[in-house]
UniProtKB/Swiss-Prot annotation:
Residues 173-187 are annotated as: Leucine-zipper. The gene is atf-4. This is Transcription factor atf-4 homolog. GO terms for biological process: hydrogen sulfide biosynthetic process; positive regulation of gene expression; regulation of transcription by RNA polymerase II. Residues 140-163 are annotated as: Basic motif. Its main location: nucleus. Residues 18-47, 106-165 are annotated as: Disordered. The lineage of its organism: Eukaryota, Metazoa, Ecdysozoa, Nematoda, Chromadorea. GO terms for molecular function: DNA-binding transcription activator activity, RNA polymerase II-specific; RNA polymerase II transcription regulatory region sequence-specific DNA binding. The keyword Transcription applies. Pfam families: bZIP_1. Residues 121-141 have a biased composition (Basic and acidic residues).
Length: 208
């Protein structure tokens, strides 16, 4: 019983808990005070088994120390990196899908634009042909033929005038060419005359 009252640091926690939870019993009978000893809960103290009490006290210390460790562990700063990377990858995949869809839409619109434009041009041509060739009566057909004959006659007359003008120009140029040739012949004749005159005057050495 002496080891319970000693100032052993291993029993400070137990003594404090015992003082808070179990107060020292008051003994009113002074006659039996020397015969009675303070009683303790059997679950915490056994005077005949100090080893089992010490083991129970150590286990309680271990449990008391492990509780704050489980709650005081700081969160891992890197635990949120993987979700962030996952979110970034998901956003990039969404953007890539949007870009591919836009390119596909643009490609389809470009591929469908050319047939549509061709169809519209063909339709416009057919409409113009219909407007140019409406349903004709025999009178309109004769009138159209007369207009075509008149246009052909005007075209042939125009070509004939152009041809006559060209021939007139050719004739004028031919006359001018003949005159120039005559002038050349006259100049050559005069050159020969002056050479002969200078030879007769003894000016041959000078001319040479």
């Amino acid at each position: 019983m002496a080891y319970v009252n000693e100032q052993n640091p291993q029993f400070l926690l137990y003594n404090g808990m015992h003082n808070q939870t179990h107060s020292t019993p008051q003994y009113h009978n002074h006659h039996h005070h020397h015969h009675q000893s303070p009683t303790y809960p059997q679950s915490y103290f056994n005077p005949y088994s100090h080893q089992s009490y010490q083991q129970h006290h150590l286990n309680s210390d271990v449990n008391f120390q492990m509780v704050p460790q489980s709650t005081s562990v700081p969160p891992d700063p890197f635990c949120s990196i993987e979700p962030m990377e996952t979110n970034v990858q998901a956003k990039e995949q969404i953007l890539e899908e949007i870009v591919r869809e836009c390119e596909e839409i643009e490609r389809r619109s470009n591929s469908s634009a050319s047939p549509a434009s061709n169809w519209s041009s063909d339709e416009h041509d057919s409409q113009s042909e219909k407007s140019y060739h409406p349903y004709k009566t025999p009178e309109k057909k004769e009138r159209k033929k007369a207009q075509n004959r008149l246009a052909a006659t005007r075209y042939r007359e125009k070509k004939r005038r152009e041809k006559e003008e060209a021939m007139t120009c050719i004739e004028g140029l031919s006359v001018t060419n003949g005159k120039l040739k005559d002038q050349v012949s006259e100049l050559e004749r005069e050159i020969r005359y002056f050479k002969k005159f200078m030879t007769e005057m003894g000016m041959k050495t000078v001319t040479d």
